[in-house]
Structure formats: structure tokens, C-alpha cells
């Protein structure tokens, strides 16, 4: 039965049957640990690799000794406000040695500002919060593969993949000859390479491979006889057209594979090589085999303490690989599965940064070498030699434009957390979504406990982007490890000792599931238990079990573990549920779920949106904006709260204290709630009284019927903040000016502007209202004598300016909540040419309305179709009206029964007045739900009689009623709905632009034209194809006719017709347009057309309608596809997909 358990500030009744042996790790340690490693060791490695730099004569030597990171100039909040990067200066100690004179110069050199990670695991780049996503790539090492030839013969291939350097591949053909490819060139007999390694004669080669028959066969194809010939043969293949010499050939082979500067296996590559080939070559021992020794886990023997990994290839590696291939041909050994997580590793922030830094340093190294030769040896200093530009540029480029550096998804705390735990197989050095096949995307047995099998985007990225499982961690080689409890095989007892295993270590062990029954001393209750080994699921005797799962939720990611009754949902729907929780909008009055999974507290705490006590103590002051704690050491810690700031996605970030003055707080306790958290628990939505029934077709096809009470009482009201900015620049005609004095604008429009011309905080604004008054100098015209006189008398004031004020865009409105002003005079850093910068923040309170998308946690999504008065909603026998009505037909075909169980348990828990936790795959059973319903004195089947709110009659059948957790998603109708009368036109075709962002028109496409043709609606059709689209003159005349109330004139020639003629003329065809009487009709250019028409009509055309030739429009028209952020940006999908709720029905 359930037992009470304190999570955060709240008690939940936990229905879990298994006790937790291991607490969840910190959920963003992936990011933090990796960056910490980079600062401590990663940077040092790069400097060590590149140091010393020698000039071509070997006389000057430049060494990098040590480095320090200074203090950042601004705090995180200031960086966001000022649009600067949160970074610290990197200073490196450099020594320059002149061998001839023996002179040594040491200097500290500034190497640029290095972006720092915030405590939340993010980076602030130019004021925007960004996340570096971890990348899943193939691990360096040696891989063996096989394929069946059309003749039915099994062929083998092996590839040696370095971290950087040339690939080496062996392959066999139908006649059992073995070939080698060096760096993707044409293949040559493998014995040529063996010969070039120093085994000159056939006899030596046969002896090396114990007279193997396949080697004998291959030798018949080999037309070299000595080591020198073999080297020359390889050189001819690699450098065709260059005169081969033995020396150049030998040095080429050495630089390709045996030079650590050119060939790098990295630690992980060397480890994988030794693991596969078991040839014992792992370390280089600087002083031979002497010196103090220690036990090494990788080699399982005593080795000297003073050792380092061998980074480059050795001859032994190549020969051992060749031997393994020969064994495979004999039928011994196993081929590798490249989708196994033992062969894929993670490159996290630290390593990605290290690689980028290495690129920058190697570019710098070239510059240093050049400067060493050019400059005078006596006056040279390290400072003069080093040019930091390439280093700074490569870091900037990585953070600013790498595919893996992404704008943080900040819709809600879960979205932030998931983004930091995301694993992407895309990006530089990874896969591309066009080339990725089905195998790479599929769930693999090695994902168990490492990568979530559920959470992945729908669409082209499915399976290429995943999420780290809750308990998984990443080891020093970049492999994911899952925790297991060790089983004492002697006593058949499960201990509490935790062992972390990588995917390939786990492969041969028998591992029991977390739900295997144990007694209180940790002994297995039953004789045989369910267990897995590799990809097999077995029923094994308990004495064979070696490990046991830590927890059922170790398989899933955080978002998936937040779904109660996950075990009763179909996987496809669970995927949607996990993904939609990330799109939940933080509500004004959010509630933690009545039916939770017990992980809500940890998710909220680790996401970084709450304020957590760093040290224990007593709360001495609580206000809306800060909390002060007097620590046990007597110091006072002050925590500043964020109030109504804008997130990356325009949702509202607001923190409010949940402790009182005089409270005792412990370290790690939550002091203040953030957005979408309540009492320190994640609270993405609301608990709402639901009935599963149809209602007059208003919830047909997943639509949702909701009570007006939800609108009145702000159940699903959220705050959205938009940012608008306006800058005053220097133009050729003089500086722009921010002012209240705007030409041709009345005082009533300026009523909310202050004396500077900037809107006041608290003003309510509507579309078209001025936010910042700004004037720009107009082009000078030839002045008449009188004007020159006036100019001379009154000075500059008579100059012509035009109004370029920042106005509220179409379709936006709200209250001004904040205004920030930056200017050159106050010493703010602004972009070149900008003198003033003003930012206005407009907040909107959005209640739930028809057209908003809502969802539960089980992938049950829908659109609000109707908001019904409370008195018309179906009500229960005691008069309580339900608050939301969902369609019961949405449940059976989709097989997400979890929502029904949640509804039952939610009703019982709400009635009894407590909250429950039902952890995934360890939750409440049907029996315990019935038991809880009985305790709450509710019907055991969770159904009750409902009465029609309009007639008071009971409905025919009893209806399932209960409490369900619903969330409002970031697909709001206010952001999608759009209409246009006149607006911008495309430059080439003169047709209206498309989309809400461009204030475009509705596309009347091919099929819509057919529809009108089918009805013979000729005039409607003509109007749509001419004046409403691209008949430039016609639309001006029509506009005028409508304004003056006259009849609309005949349409003219559409611009697209003129474009067609121009295209035909460009093919060299002489195209003329003839009237019925065979007279040629002259087709004018647009400008002539418009200006003539405008003259005839005597109207002054507004700027944009004359002909839009702004650069932005051209760019928008030729929509450039930009894949800089390759993560699942569901909120950027086109409106047409937004409401396709279900494809299957």
C-alpha cells in the first residue's frame, strides 16, 4: 500500500513497491563536469600538444607554461541586459628561448575573453542564453564488418578510425585476397603495406603470419619484392604524378600514421584498440619499465606509475588488426555492431570546445612560425610573435554559429533541463539527416539505462536526437555508463554496492530487473528471475545473476519519467506526451500535479529556475525581490529574485519566495519558486475536473470543451512578454534622434511618451501606438533663396526630417512592463554607428481561448473548440459541474490508458485531500486504485451519473469522471491568427508576401483556383488573379475606387504575365502582345505605370506601397533554409502542421 514521503516542501503518498537504493544524480552534471574538465585539463592538453613551437632553423623556441582565467567583467544578469558575452580573460604564461644566445624571455600574454558556463549549465553569448548540446559520434578505434557477396560468399572489411588523421582500411574479395586502402585511395594488396613496415621478404611475411593460406594467396597479387619497392608503390598511389623516392615515401608513411602531430587516436581510440585486439599496447613508459608501479584496470596488470597513452598508431597495431582479420576469415572472432553504444561516444561541451580551441591554436602556430623567420631576433618578444585573432575567432565561431550551439529552449523549466541533457547525432563530424538510415535511428538494446527509448522528436530528426536517461553518467572516455547493484553470487544476495558499467562491459553479464522480488535482507525470494543478457531476455536461476537494475526509471529520461502510469501507455503516445510537456507555457496560477511520479521536485530544483539555499541558516528578511538568510557561520546570504523578465521564447520568468521570516532552512532547500514550479515541484499545468463523454459534437476529432469557469478564474492564464528595440544610428545625412518632437503627429498620440520621447512604464498600448519617437534626416533638396534665408536665420532647425518611430506591430498589444535605455554618453558598449538603444517590454495576459492547443501527459492533445458557460456544463449528482469534457473515442484506438487511470486516482486523491506519487513502471496497481476509490467513498469503477446542464436530465449512461492534469501548450491562437488588407509585395513577382511575420496574404493556390473554376465564378477568379494579387496599376485604382465609393474599374495586366514575357525574351524569343485588332499592346515597366496612374488619380502613394524594394523582403522571399539550430523546434513548425493532431484517424 502507499506510504507518505516528503518531497521538497510537500508530502506525497508514494505507491511505489520498490525502495530506491540510489538518489538521482544532479541532472545537469553532464554539462558542468565536462566544462570543469576543460578548464582544469582540456586547455592544458591543447597547450601541451602545441608547445614548443620552433622556427624552421630550430633556433627560437616558444613554450606555453601555464594559464589563468581572470574574473568576468559583468555578472550573468548584467550580461543579458547589456547584450554582451559572459566571459573571463584568459592569460597564458609564455617563454621564448633563443638557443644561439641562450637568452630566455618570459611574458604573460592575453589570449582573448573565454566564455564561462553559468551555474545553470548555459552560456551567455551576446546577451542570449545558449546551450551546447552533446554530440553522439562513432568512437575512434578499429571496426570489423562483414557482408554477403551476391555469389553468397562472406566478405570482411576492417576500418581503423582515428580522432584525427588518415583512415586505414583492409578488405577481402571473392578470391580471398586481402587489400588495403590508405586514406580512401585505390586499393593495393595488403602485403605491400606489411612489406613497407619493414618485413621485406616473402619469407618474413609468411613467418609473421604463420604460413596463412590467405596471405599466400594475397602474395600472388603483390608485385613488389623488397621494402623499398613497397614504399615506392604506396607513394605512387598516394601522390600520383610526383617523382617517388624511397626517403620521401618512408617519411610520407611516417607522417600519415606514426606522427602524433598528424595522427591522433585520442585516449579513447587507444583504449578501444587494445580492448578489441587485446595486444597489450596501451601506454608509453618514459623511463622504461622501471620506477614505482600500480595496478591498471585496463590492462589488468602492474604497470609503472609514470606512463602516458600512445596517441599514434604503431606497427604492432596494424599487424594485430591484420591477424584479427585473418582469424575472422577462418571463422574466429566477432564483427562489430556500429550502432552499439559501446562503439558510439559522447562529445560534450568540454571536448567540443577543446577541438575548436585546438583549431584556433594551430592557425596561430603558423603565424608564430612565419613571424619568427621574418622579425629581428634581438627585439622579438612572445607578445610580438603571438597573434590571438585566430584563437578568438574560432571560439566565437563555435559559440555563435556551430550546429551544436543552440539558442536555449526556455519555454519552461523542463524544456531547459531537457535541452541540456540532449544528445544529437547531427552536427560537424556526425551524421546528416538525409543520409541517416533506419538502423542508426532505431532503439538498440544498449540504450537500456543510457539513452531514453521514448523521448525523441517526431519528424525528420527522429532517432537522431535523444535524451540522456535519468541515472546515466558519462565516463572519462565519453561512453555512457548505467548504474547497477552488485549481486554477491556466493550468498545469492543483492548488495547496495553500486557499479557503473559501459555498454560493452555490460554485454556478457546477466542482469536482473529492478522489480525482481527481494526480502528485507536483500535475498531473492524466487528461485528464477527475469534477467537480460545482451539483447536476450531470459528466465534464469538466481545463482547466475551478477547485477541488478537500480530503479525502473533508469531506462527513461526526465521528461518521460514525469508521465504517471507510463506502463499503461502506448510508446508512440508516450513520446508525444514527453515532447509536449516541454512545450507547456508557465501559467499564472500553476499547480503541481495531484498524481505525480515523485521526480517533480528534482526536475524543478536541477533546472535552475528556483532559488536554492547555498548554506543552511535562518531566514532574516523576505520581500518580493529578495530573500536574506543568516548562515550558521554568522554571514548573511542575499538572494535576488527575478521579477517578470522575458525568457528566450517570450514566456514570463518570475520568482516568488516560499519561505517566511524566521524559518530554518537547510543547504539545498528551495527558497523561491520559479516559473512553472509550485512549492519546489515542477508544475506545468492544472488539475482539472474531467468527464470523458461526447457533447453535441463539440469534442469531435480531439477537440476540447472547457468551462467558462476556467477562463474566469484564470486556470490557464499565462503572461507573455515581447521585446521591441529601437536604435538611433549615424546616417550619411546626419544622426537619427530619439525625441518627442515628431512631425505631423498630434498630442493625443504622444500622451504616453515622456519628455525624451520614450513610452512610460505601465502604459497600455495597442497596434500602431508609438513606443519610441525617432526622426531621421531626409535627403537634402535644392533650396530656394527664401529657404536659404530661413536656414541662415534659424539655423539647422528648418532641416527636413521624417518620422521613423518604433510602433507596436500589427496584432500585438499589452502593458509596458519595462524600458531600458542605453547610450554612448553613459559609457554603454553599443555596436559601431549606434548612439542610443531603447528596449521596450510589452506584457500580455492571455486567458485560454478557442483555438489554443492543450494536452495531457499521455500524448492526448487537442484544440479548445468551445468555452461553455458553467451552468451549461454537465454536472454531478451533488451539483458540481465538470470543468473540461474530453472525447472518450480518443482513448481506445490510441492505447494511452494511463490517462484513465490518472483520472480515477486523481479523483480519489483529490477527495481524500492528499497528493500521490506513482513512479514509472513501479506505480499504483489497479487494485490499489480501487482500494483508494473505496476509501474516498467513490464508485469503484470511477463512473457516476451526469446531468445535462441545459435540461437537468441525466445522460443515458454513467460517465467516467475524475481529475486529470492538463497543460496549455506554446501553440497559442493569438500567435497564429492573422489577416491582411494591404501590405508589402514581393519585388520580382509583385505578389503579396506570405506568412504572419511578413504581414502576408493568404495563398490562393492551384487547387483553390480549380474550385472556383468548377463553379464558374469568373469574376471572383479574375479579381483574385489580378487586383488582389499582382496587377500593380489595377490595385492602386481599386483602392482609390473603394475609398471614393465608386465602382471598381476593369483589372489590368498581372505582373506575373510581364515576368513570363521577360523570361521568354531572355530565351531570345521575340514576344509581342497583340490586341484583337492585331495592334501591338505596349507593356510598360512598373515604375512608369505606377507614377503615371498616381499622377492621373492625384494621390500621394505611401512608401511601402509604391514598390517594396527593401533588402529584407528579397531575403524573405527567397526563404533561405538555415539549419543552424538542428534541434526539434516544434514551435517553429508552419501553421499548417500545428493543428494536425493525428494522422492515424
Swiss-Prot record:
List the GO biological process terms. DNA-templated transcription
Quote the biased-composition stretches of kind Acidic residues, using this chain's numbering.
1113-1145
Could you tell me what reaction this enzyme catalyses?
RNA(n) + a ribonucleoside 5'-triphosphate = RNA(n+1) + diphosphate
Q: Looking at the keywords, is Flavoprotein present?
A: no
Q: Basic and acidic residues bias located where?
A: 1101-1112
UniProt keyword annotations, A-Z:
DNA-directed RNA polymerase, Nucleotidyltransferase, Transcription, Transferase
Region Disordered, as annotated, extends over 1101-1145
Matching Pfam families: RNA_pol_Rpb2_1 (PF04563), RNA_pol_Rpb2_2 (PF04561), RNA_pol_Rpb2_3 (PF04565), RNA_pol_Rpb2_45 (PF10385), RNA_pol_Rpb2_6 (PF00562), RNA_pol_Rpb2_7 (PF04560)
- Which terms in the GO cellular component ontology are assigned? DNA-directed RNA polymerase complex
Where are its TM segments located? none
Q: Which EC class does it fall in?
A: transferase
Name the Enzyme Commission number(s) assigned to this protein. 2.7.7.6
Gene Ontology molecular functions: DNA binding; DNA-directed RNA polymerase activity; ribonucleoside binding
Checking InterPro entries in the record gives:
DNA-dir_RNA_pol_bsu_ext_1_sf, DNA-dir_RNA_pol_bsu_external_1, DNA-dir_RNA_pol_su2, DNA-dir_RNAP_su2_dom, DNA-dir_RNAP_su2_hyb_sf, RNA_pol_bsu_bac, RNA_pol_bsu_CS, RNA_pol_bsu_protrusion
Does the entry feature the keyword Transcription, yes or no? yes
- Its biological purpose: DNA-dependent RNA polymerase catalyzes the transcription of DNA into RNA using the four ribonucleoside triphosphates as substrates.
**What does the record note on quaternary structure?**
The RNAP catalytic core consists of 2 alpha, 1 beta, 1 beta' and 1 omega subunit. When a sigma factor is associated with the core the holoenzyme is formed, which can initiate transcription.
* Name of the protein in its database record: DNA-directed RNA polymerase subunit beta
Amino acid at each position: 500500500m502507499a506510504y507518505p514521503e516528503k518531497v521538497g516542501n510537500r508530502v506525497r503518498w508514494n505507491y511505489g513497491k520498490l525502495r530506491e537504493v540510489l538518489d538521482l544524480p544532479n541532472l545537469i552534471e553532464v554539462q558542468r563536469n565536462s566544462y570543469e574538465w576543460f578548464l582544469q585539463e582540456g586547455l592544458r592538453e591543447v597547450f601541451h600538444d602545441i608547445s614548443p613551437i620552433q622556427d624552421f632553423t630550430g633556433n627560437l623556441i616558444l613554450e606555453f607554461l601555464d594559464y589563468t582565467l581572470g574574473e568576468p567583467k559583468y555578472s550573468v544578469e548584467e550580461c543579458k541586459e547589456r547584450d554582451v558575452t559572459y566571459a573571463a580573460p584568459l592569460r597564458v604564461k609564455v617563454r621564448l628561448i633563443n638557443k644561439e644566445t641562450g637568452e630566455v624571455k618570459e611574458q604573460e600574454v592575453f589570449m582573448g575573453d573565454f566564455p564561462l558556463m553559468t551555474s545553470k549549465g548555459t552560456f551567455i553569448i551576446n546577451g542570449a542564453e545558449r546551450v551546447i548540446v552533446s554530440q553522439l559520434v562513432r568512437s575512434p578505434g578499429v571496426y570489423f564488418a562483414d557482408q554477403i557477396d551476391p555469389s553468397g560468399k562472406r566478405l570482411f572489411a576492417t576500418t581503423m578510425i582515428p580522432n584525427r588523421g588518415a583512415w586505414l582500411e583492409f578488405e577481402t574479395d571473392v578470391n580471398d585476397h586481402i587489400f588495403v586502402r590508405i586514406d580512401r585511395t585505390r586499393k593495393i594488396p595488403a602485403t605491400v603495406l606489411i612489406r613497407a613496415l619493414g618485413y621485406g621478404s616473402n619469407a618474413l611475411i609468411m613467418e609473421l603470419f604463420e604460413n596463412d593460406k590467405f596471405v599466400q594467396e594475397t602474395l600472388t597479387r603483390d608485385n613488389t619484392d623488397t621494402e623499398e619497392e613497397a614504399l615506392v608503390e604506396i607513394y605512387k598511389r598516394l601522390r600520383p604524378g610526383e617523382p617517388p623516392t624511397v626517403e620521401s615515401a618512408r617519411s610520407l608513411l611516417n607522417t600519415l600514421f606514426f606522427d602524433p602531430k598528424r595522427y591522433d587516436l585520442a585516449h579513447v581510440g587507444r583504449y578501444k584498440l587494445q580492448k578489441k585486439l587485446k595486444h597489450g599496447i596501451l601506454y608509453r613508459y618514459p623511463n622504461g619499465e622501471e620506477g614505482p608501479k600500480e595496478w591498471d584496470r585496463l590492462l589488468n596488470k602492474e604497470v609503472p606509475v609514470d606512463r602516458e597513452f600512445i596517441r599514434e598508431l604503431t606497427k604492432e597495431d596494424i599487424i594485430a588488426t591484420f591477424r584479427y582479420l585473418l582469424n575472422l576469415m577462418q571463422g574466429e572472432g566477432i564483427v562489430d555492431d556500429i550502432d552499439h553504444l559501446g562503439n558510439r561516444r559522447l562529445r560534450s561541451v568540454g571536448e567540443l570546445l577543446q577541438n575548436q580551441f585546438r583549431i584556433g591554436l594551430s592557425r596561430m602556430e603558423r603565424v608564430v612560425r612565419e613571424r619568427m623567420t621574418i622579425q629581428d631576433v634581438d627585439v622579438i618578444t612572445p607578445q610580438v610573435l603571438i597573434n590571438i585573432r585566430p584563437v578568438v575567432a574560432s571560439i566565437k565561431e563555435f559559440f555563435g554559429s556551430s550546429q551544436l550551439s543552440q539558442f536555449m529552449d526556455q519555454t519552461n523549466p523542463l524544456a531547459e533541463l531537457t535541452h541540456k541533457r540532449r544528445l544529437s547525432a547531427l552536427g560537424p563530424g556526425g551524421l546528416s539527416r538525409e543520409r541517416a538510415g533506419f538502423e542508426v535511428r532505431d532503439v538498440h538494446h544498449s540504450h537500456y539505462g543510457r539513452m531514453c527509448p521514448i523521448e525523441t522528436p517526431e519528424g525528420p530528426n527522429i532517432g537522431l536526437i535523444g535524451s540522456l536517461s535519468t541515472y546515466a553518467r558519462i565516463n572519462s572516455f565519453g561512453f555512457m555508463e548505467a548504474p547497477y547493484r552488485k549481486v554477491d553470487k556466493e550468498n545469492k544476495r543483492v548488495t547496495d554496492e553500486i557499479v557503473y558499467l559501459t555498454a560493452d562491459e555490460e554485454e556478457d553479464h546477466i542482469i536482473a530487473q529492478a522489480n525482481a522480488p527481494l526480502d528485507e535482507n536483500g535475498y531473492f525470494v524466487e528461485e528464477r528471475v527475469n534477467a537480460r543478457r545482451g539483447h536476450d531476455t531470459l528466465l534464469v536461476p538466481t545463482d547466475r545473476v551478477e547485477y541488478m537494475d537500480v530503479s525502473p526509471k533508469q531506462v527513461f529520461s526526465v521528461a518521460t519519467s514525469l508521465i504517471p502510469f507510463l506502463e499503461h501507455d502506448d510508446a508512440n503516445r508516450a513520446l508525444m506526451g514527453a515532447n509536449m510537456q516541454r512545450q507547456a507555457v508557465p501559467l499564472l496560477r500553476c499547480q503541481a500535479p495531484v498524481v505525480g511520479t515523485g521526480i517533480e521536485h528534482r526536475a524543478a530544483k536541477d533546472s535552475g529556475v528556483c532559488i536554492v539555499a547555498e548554506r543552511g541558516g535562518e531566514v532574516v528578511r523576505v520581500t518580493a525581490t529578495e530573500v536574506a538568510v543568516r548562515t550558521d557561520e554568522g554571514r548573511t546570504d542575499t538572494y535576488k529574485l527575478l521579477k517578470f523578465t522575458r525568457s528566450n521564447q517570450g514566456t514570463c520568468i518570475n520568482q516568488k519566495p516560499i519561505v517566511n521570516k524566521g524559518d530554518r532552512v537547510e543547504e539545498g532547500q528551495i527558497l523561491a519558486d520559479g516559473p512553472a514550479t509550485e512549492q519546489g515541484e515542477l508544475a506545468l499545468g492544472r488539475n482539472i475536473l474531467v468527464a470523458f463523454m461526447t457533447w453535441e459534437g463539440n469534442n469531435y476529432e480531439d477537440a476540447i470543451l472547457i468551462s467558462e469557469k476556467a477562463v474566469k478564474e484564470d486556470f490557464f492564464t499565462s503572461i507573455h512578454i515581447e521585446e521591441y528595440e529601437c536604435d538611433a544610428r549615424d546616417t550619411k545625412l546626419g544622426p537619427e534622434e530619439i525625441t518627442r518632437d515628431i512631425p505631423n503627429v498630434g498630442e493625443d498620440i504622444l500622451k504616453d511618451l515622456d519628455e525624451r520621447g520614450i513610452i512610460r512604464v505601465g502604459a497600455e498600448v495597442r497596434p500602431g501606438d508609438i513606443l519610441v519617437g525617432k526622426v531621421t534626416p531626409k535627403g537634402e533638396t535644392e533650396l530656394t533663396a527664401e529657404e536659404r534665408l530661413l536656414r541662415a536665420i534659424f539655423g539647422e532647425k528648418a532641416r527636413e526630417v521624417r518620422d521613423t518611430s518604433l510602433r507596436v506591430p500589427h496584432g500585438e498589444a499589452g502593458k509596458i512592463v519595462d524600458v531600458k535605455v542605453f547610450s554612448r554618453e553613459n559609457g554603454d558598449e553599443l555596436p559601431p554607428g549606434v548612439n542610443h538603444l531603447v528596449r521596450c517590454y510589452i506584457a500580455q495576459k492571455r486567458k485560454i481561448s478557442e483555438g489554443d492547443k492543450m494536452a495531457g501527459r499521455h500524448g492526448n492533445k487537442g484544440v479548445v473548440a468551445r468555452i461553455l458557460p458553467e451552468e451549461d456544463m454537465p454536472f454531478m449528482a451533488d451539483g458540481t459541474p465538470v470543468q473540461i469534457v474530453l472525447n472518450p473515442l480518443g482513448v481506445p484506438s490510441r492505447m494511452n490508458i494511463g490517462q484513465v487511470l490518472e483520472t480515477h486516482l486523481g479523483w480519489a486523491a483529490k477527495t481524500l485531500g492528499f497528493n500521490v506519487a506513482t513512479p514509472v513502471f513501479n506505480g499504483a496497481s489497479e487494485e490499489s486504485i480501487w482500494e483508494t476509490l473505496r476509501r474516498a467513498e467513490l464508485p469503484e469503477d470511477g463512473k457516476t451519473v451526469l446531468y445535462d446542464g441545459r435540461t437537468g436530465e441525466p445522460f443515458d449512461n454513467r460517465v467516467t469522471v475524475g481529475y486529470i492534469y492538463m497543460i496549455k501548450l506554446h501553440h497559442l491562437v493569438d500567435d497564429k491568427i492573422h489577416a491582411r488588407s494591404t501590405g508589402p509585395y514581393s519585388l520580382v513577382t509583385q505578389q503579396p508576401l506570405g506568412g504572419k511575420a511578413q504581414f502576408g496574404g493568404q495563398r490562393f493556390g492551384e487547387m483553390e483556383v480549380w474550385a472556383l473554376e468548377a463553379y464558374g465564378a469568373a469574376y471572383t477568379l479574375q479579381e483574385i488573379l489580378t487586383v488582389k494579387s499582382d496587377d500593380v496599376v489595377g490595385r492602386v485604382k481599386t483602392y482609390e475606387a473603394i475609398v471614393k465609393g465608386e465602382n471598381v474599374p476593369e483589372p489590368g495586366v498581372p505582373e506575373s504575365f510581364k515576368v513570363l514575357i521577360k523570361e521568354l525574351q531572355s530565351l531570345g524569343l521575340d514576344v509581342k502582345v497583340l490586341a484583337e485588332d492585331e495592334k501591338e499592346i505596349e507593356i510598360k515597366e512598373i515604375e512608369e505605370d505606377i507614377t503615371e496612374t498616381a499622377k492621373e488619380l492625384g494621390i500621394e502613394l505611401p512608401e511601402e506601397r509604391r514598390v517594396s524594394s527593401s533588402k529584407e523582403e528579397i531575403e524573405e522571399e527567397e526563404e533561405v533554409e538555415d539549419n543552424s539550430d538542428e534541434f526539434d523546434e516544434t514551435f517553429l513548425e508552419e501553421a499548417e502542421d500545428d493543428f494536425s493532431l493525428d494522422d492515424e484517424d
